[in-house]
């Protein structure tokens, strides 16, 4: 059967196995493939970002034919252009929209109501940072507008009101009162008042001057049976307030985000785990008063937990993970910036197949106590499930870790190793480095103990020295196994090697060949030359984001040769590359037609005239950062 005669439904099913970028390319084959690709994209609920510019009007009409359901409008204000964009969205996209994001917009109440009433199928609405809407306090103050809003928001399930400095009890009640099916709410970084009763015992919570926790409790009591997710990040919620919240009768939360709630205590978290045992996602990042006791309470009380974020807890140690084996459903664990965590307890749990969780995402970013031995053990244990691994700024890990990752984690899609300065070309290539330093300096040396001056031979640093982490047999088996190069991670979609300053062309040109790679950072690698740039471009032709800032040896010749292989590139950062000139911009504008943002800051060889010419050749939505270019301190938005 000829491919063009296949039913659209069959082609749609085939395309569903491809990445989004590949589906976009497939849509250019013919009309049938175009409609099939649009169907598959619509099923993924792809979010379309639409800036408030005159050039967006034609785009909106085009999106209407695709019946898109998720839209984010940016840079809206009271200008005529913004009103035209709102009118176009209301007319062409409104009837089909299910998700609408207006984050940070400065639109008027009239424009908002006009847009809202044109979207009767909304299930998600993001008004975070839209302070102009709430400044006057008159939003939804008229009976007729309330009735219209109720009809428009009858299916709304998710509402984001984060970072609204003028949100009050009155405006909160008006807005949530129009959404009877609301199940998810964000009040992150709002000025909630805790600890006192501004109403002095009255139950008439309608202040136009403040947003009170008592009013939030009233709302939760009314919606307890259907409410599922709450975000109070960046608020001053106290332990007594947490007690009142988790004990609301009938409330069964599934997700709770409490980032940077610095007044929460271990006791508050214990109460949370006791009264909300059905939580599947908990984020306690930056709750600085929490310690091991809180982590132990989570392990003991939240057996259904799938996502746990404990980043930036400076009091958390490995002891807090003694009970982590109880979290059998855990899929995501974030321990970034926990400076006292080495991962030893997690290693013990993961070493036992009957105890280890099926972790898909693990972050040890900025955990300076993490060692190669722990990485090796975790890589072996989590091989079947792990897809995302973040070891950024784990300054103690070496080539042993990268070779363990390449050998045992072939299904990784995201790997972040930024600022791991001990990584070398040998590690990426999977070759054992000859220790010339040891052979040269193997003679006697002074001991470090000045109280017992003498001579000794420095002991060899073997992984077998830590029996808690890796047994002798396991270590020997690993050493006998053929070392894999980084190229073994064939499914990588994101790779960050920023500031791994010992890496050179020797490894980059040979191993950075990933057909599915979409994001790559090679910034602050001073030894990289045009050879690496060309090799990366040819080996990673699906790249959408590339960062090579402060790679001082890159020249125009490299970009002229590489640009034709980077046709899908959308974001490029080459700031601080001092040898680049306008020829690089000419090559990029000619070949990288999908580019959305470019950073050429501190590229002294590029002039403002070059940028003006680049502006004329690329689509208007491209943003160019050009600080300190040609001696100027300017930032162009084209």
Regions found by a protein language model. Name each.
Residues 546, 568-638:
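C-terminal interaction modules of eukaryotic adaptor/scaffold proteins
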Residues 167, 182-184, 193-194, 238, ...:
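Short loop/beta submotifs within extracellular cysteine-rich repeat domains
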Residues 72-75, 101, 126, 160, ...:
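Conserved positional slot within leucine-rich repeat
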């Amino acid at each position: 059967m000829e491919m063009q005669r296949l039913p659209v439904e069959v082609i749609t099913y085939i395309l569903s196995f491809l990445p989004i970028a590949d589906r976009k390319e497939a849509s250019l084959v013919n009309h049938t493939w175009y409609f099939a690709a649009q169907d598959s994209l619509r099923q993924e609920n792809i979010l379309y970002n639409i800036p408030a510019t005159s050039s967006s009007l034609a785009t909106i009409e085009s999106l209407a034919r695709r019946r898109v359901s998720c839209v984010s409008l940016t840079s809206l204000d009271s200008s005529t252009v913004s009103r035209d964009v709102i009118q176009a969205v209301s007319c062409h996209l409104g009837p089909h929209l299910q998700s609408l994001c207006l984050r940070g917009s400065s639109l008027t109440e009239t424009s908002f109501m006009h847009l809202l009433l044109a979207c009767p199928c909304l299930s998600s609405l993001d008004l975070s940072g839209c302070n102009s809407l709430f400044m006057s306090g008159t939003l939804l103050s008229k009976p007729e507008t309330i009735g219209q809003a109720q009809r428009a928001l009858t299916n709304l399930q998710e509402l984001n009101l984060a970072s609204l400095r003028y949100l009050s009890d009155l405006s909160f009640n008006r807005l949530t009162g129009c959404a009877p099916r609301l199940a998810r709410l964000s009040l992150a970084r709002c000025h909630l008042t805790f600890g006192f009763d501004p109403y002095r015992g009255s139950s008439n919570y309608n202040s136009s001057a403040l947003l009170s926790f008592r009013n939030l409790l009233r709302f939760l009591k009314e919606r307890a049976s259907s409410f599922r997710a709450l975000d109070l990040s960046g608020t001053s919620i106290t332990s007594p307030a947490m007690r009142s919240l988790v004990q609301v009768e009938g409330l069964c939360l599934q997700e709770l985000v409490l980032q940077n709630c610095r007044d929460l205590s271990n006791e508050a978290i214990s109460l949370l785990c006791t009264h909300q045992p059905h939580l599947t996602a908990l984020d306690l990042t930056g709750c600085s008063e929490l310690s091991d006791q809180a982590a132990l309470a989570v392990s003991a009380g939240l057996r259904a937990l799938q996502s746990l974020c404990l980043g930036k807890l400076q009091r958390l140690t490995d002891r807090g993970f003694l009970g982590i084996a109880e979290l059998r459903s855990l899929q995501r664990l974030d321990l970034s910036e926990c400076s006292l965590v080495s991962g030893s307890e997690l290693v013990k749990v993961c070493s036992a197949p009957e105890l280890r969780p099926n972790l898909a995402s693990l972050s040890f970013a900025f955990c300076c106590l993490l060692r190669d031995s722990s990485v090796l053990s975790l890589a072996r244990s989590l091989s079947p499930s792990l897809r995302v691994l973040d070891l950024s700024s784990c300054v103690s890990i070496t080539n042993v870790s990268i070779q363990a990752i390449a050998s045992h984690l072939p299904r990784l899609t995201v790997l972040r190793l930024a600022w791991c300065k001990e990584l070398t070309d040998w590690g990426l290539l999977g070759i054992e480095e000859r220790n010339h330093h040891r052979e040269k300096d193997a003679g006697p040396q002074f001991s470090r103990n000045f109280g017992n001056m003498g001579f000794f031979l420095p002991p060899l640093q073997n992984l077998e020295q830590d029996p808690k982490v890796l047994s002798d047999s396991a270590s020997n088996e690993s050493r006998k196994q053929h070392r894999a190069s980084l190229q073994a991670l064939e499914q990588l979609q994101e790779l960050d090697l920023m500031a791994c300053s010992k890496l050179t062309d020797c490894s980059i040109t040979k191993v950075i060949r990933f057909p599915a790679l979409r994001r790559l950072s090679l910034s602050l690698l001073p030894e990289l030359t045009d050879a690496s740039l060309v090799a990366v471009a040819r080996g990673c032709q699906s790249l959408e984001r590339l960062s090579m800032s402060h790679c001082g040896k890159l020249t125009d010749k490299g970009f002229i040769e590489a640009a034709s292989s980077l046709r899908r590139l959308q974001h490029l950062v080459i700031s601080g590359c001092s040898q680049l000139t306008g020829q690089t911009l000419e090559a990029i504008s000619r070949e990288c037609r999908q580019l959305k943002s470019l950073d050429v800051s501190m590229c002294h060889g590029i002039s403002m005239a070059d940028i003006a010419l680049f502006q004329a050749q690329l689509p208007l939505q491209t943003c160019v950062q050009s600080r300190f270019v040609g001696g100027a301190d300017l930032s162009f938005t084209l």
